[in-house]
Swiss-Prot record:
One Gene Ontology cellular component annotation held by this UniProt entry: cell outer membrane
Main location: membrane
Signal peptide: 1-19
Lipid linkage positions (N-palmitoyl cysteine): 20
Name assigned to this protein: 17 kDa surface antigen
Family label: Belongs to the rickettsiale 17 kDa surface antigen family.
UniProt entry tagged with the keyword Signal: yes
Keywords: Cell outer membrane, Lipoprotein, Membrane, Palmitate, Signal
Xref: PANTHER family: OUTER MEMBRANE LIPOPROTEIN (PTHR35603:SF2), PTHR35603
InterPro entries: Anti_2, Bact_OM_lipoprot/Surf_antigen, Gly_zipper_2TM_dom, Surface_antigen_Rickettsia
Source organism of this protein record: Rickettsia bellii (strain RML369-C)
Entries under PROSITE patterns matching the protein: PROKAR_LIPOPROTEIN (PS51257)
Localization: Cell outer membrane
Record keyword Iron-sulfur present: no
Amino acid sequence: MKIISKIIVILLAASMLQACQGPGGMNKQGSGTLIGGTAGALLGSQFGGGTGRLAAVGAGALLGAILGNQIGAGMDEQDRKLAELTSQRALEAAPSGSSVQWRNPDNGNYGTVTPSKAYKNNTGQYCREYTQTVVVGGKQQKAYGTACRQPDGQWQVVN
């Protein structure tokens, strides 16, 4: 029971620290670092005694923070991968004005890409203007840009 109480206190403290980050809070990578480090320190405190225990707490905190950071970064990366794959698919095959959607089932983030009519630029590349809408943590962001088809078939953002 003693360890469960410690875990609850540490998670509450981590939540309060995250809330101090202001509007939007801490990103997933920062949250993962904080929670992983806290959990690692708690786990490390269960080993050794005296200076040995102190070393175990430090090592546990460091390893937990590294692992938590990587897990948080992977989640953000998944959103970017889904958005990029959807952009490529929309620019290559979607009719003008038709939105193609992506959704990350792990965190609920989602977005759409809506391309306009394709045209050839002055170097002969096919290009399309597009609108991209992304909703992360319930907050919507919209961006406009132009992408051109490269010789390898990939679309590259040019502005």
